[in-house]
């Protein structure tokens, strides 16, 4: 079997662009994968198109060879964009391989370890603050005050979610706003230091959510790159009484992350922004986190399984970074089904309602668990007609 064509397709996803790669073969089998576009500040699409020139003619059933060969061409100028582009091609090859053998992707790696995976509600409330007009247009209740966070907590429990994760939301201006400094351009985002008042406001926000959740549903906070080591420690120590499922943060320095983990009783989750086994090695071998977050769309599912195996050797659980659409959900689900050391899976349940039509078989969730399908490949194809019905706006 040979790759004959590689295309990228995109559609309007509301506040984001939904992006897909389509890999065609000489035997008529088509492989799909979802990928992120824009996280690096520029588009990954031209990078995928550049790698496509080398990938055409390769055998997609040899997905590991395809991935390693393409990555080898980047050694003098490796980086996140290259990894993400190669990962998209690798993942589409995995879909082809599963379809060619008539099995789900997890079966290519000895799975499944489980037939369902617990999920948590990510960006709970915070994205409704960040994109208020869109969410109200889609029929979701707005978040205007702390009482609305309590209401959302109750809603999450009623839907069976095992945990929820939010981001800092402040109410000290005329309108509430989400603050996730460190990498998103906003006033003061380069300071990377919360004031005592801001930390106090974060505690109040989490207390409001906890009131709605009760004591048996996990509560997480994601502050991304918003602090330096000292700031992360101040925040983590202030949150200890809340008994968080985890505090999620990002840093490029393994020693700093180790200082944070060892300096607080709050469980620490991190590493979602890393690419490749070698970047993960010092963090995992140094036991810098309670939960290692791996992105199977940025790294590729096969490469991510290698990272997860390394984590397992150091008694560390894995959770996938997964703030994407329905095909991405299915890809992360297959990744989780192939792992023994997965803890929980990220899910954004309040997306633009039309995005479920972008796949032929949307994921099924029962009592807070996403069910692992037995269909070949990822378990669904992309609905190209639905993509055409929702073209990108203002491109």
Task: Cite the ranges covered by each PLM segment.
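Conserved, mostly hydrophobic/aromatic
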Residues: 3, 28, 51, 89, ...
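Glycine-rich phosphate/pyrophosphate-binding beta-alpha loops
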Residues: 11-14, 34-42, 75, 122-129
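Shared catalytic-loop signature of beta/alpha-barrel
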Residues: 46, 51, 65, 237-244, ...
């Amino acid at each position: 079997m040979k790759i004959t064509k590689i295309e990228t397709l995109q559609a309007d996803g509301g506040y984001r662009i939904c992006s897909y790669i389509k890999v065609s073969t000489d035997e008529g089998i088509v492989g799909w994968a979802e990928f992120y576009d824009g996280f690096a500040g520029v588009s990954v699409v031209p990078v995928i198109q550049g790698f496509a020139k080398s990938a055409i003619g390769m055998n997609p059933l040899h997905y590991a060879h395809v991935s390693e060969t393409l990555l080898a061409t980047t050694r003098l100028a490796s980086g996140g964009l290259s990894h993400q582009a190669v990962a998209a091609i690798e993942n589409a090859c995995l879909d082809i391989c599963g379809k060619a053998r008539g099995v789900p992707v997890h079966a290519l790696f000895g799975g499944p370890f489980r037939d369902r995976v617990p999920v948590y509600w990510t960006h709970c409330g915070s994205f409704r603050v960040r994109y208020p007009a869109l969410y109200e247009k889609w029929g979701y209740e707005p978040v205007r005050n702390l009482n609305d966070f309590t209401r959302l907590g109750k809603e999450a429990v009623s839907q069976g979610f095992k945990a929820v994760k939010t981001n800092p939301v402040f109410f000290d201006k005329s309108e509430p706003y989400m603050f996730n400094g460190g990498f998103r351009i906003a006033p003061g985002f380069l300071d990377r230091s919360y004031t005592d008042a801001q930390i106090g406001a974060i505690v109040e926000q989490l207390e409001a959510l906890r009131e709605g959740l009760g004591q048996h549903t996990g509560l997480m906070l994601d502050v991304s790159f918003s602090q330096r080591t000292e700031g992360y420690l101040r925040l983590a120590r202030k949150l200890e009484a809340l008994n968080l499922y985890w505090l999620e943060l990002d840093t490029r320095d393994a020693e700093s992350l180790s200082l944070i983990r060892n300096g607080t009783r709050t469980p620490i989750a991190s590493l979602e922004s890393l690419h490749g086994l070698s970047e993960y090695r010092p963090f995992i071998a140094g036991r810098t986190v309670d939960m290692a977050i791996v992105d199977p769309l940025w790294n590729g599912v096969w490469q991510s399984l290698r990272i997860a195996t390394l984590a397992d050797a150091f008694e560390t659980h894995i959770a996938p970074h997964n703030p994407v659409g329905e095909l991405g959900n299915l890809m992360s689900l297959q990744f989780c089904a192939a792992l023994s050391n997965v803890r929980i899976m990220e899910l954004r349940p309040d997306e633009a309602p039309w995005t479920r039509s972008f796949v032929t078989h949307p994921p099924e969730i029962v009592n807070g668990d996403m069910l692992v399908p037995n269909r070949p490949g990822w378990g669904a194809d992309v609905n190209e007609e639905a993509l055409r019905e929702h073209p990108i706006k203002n491109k």
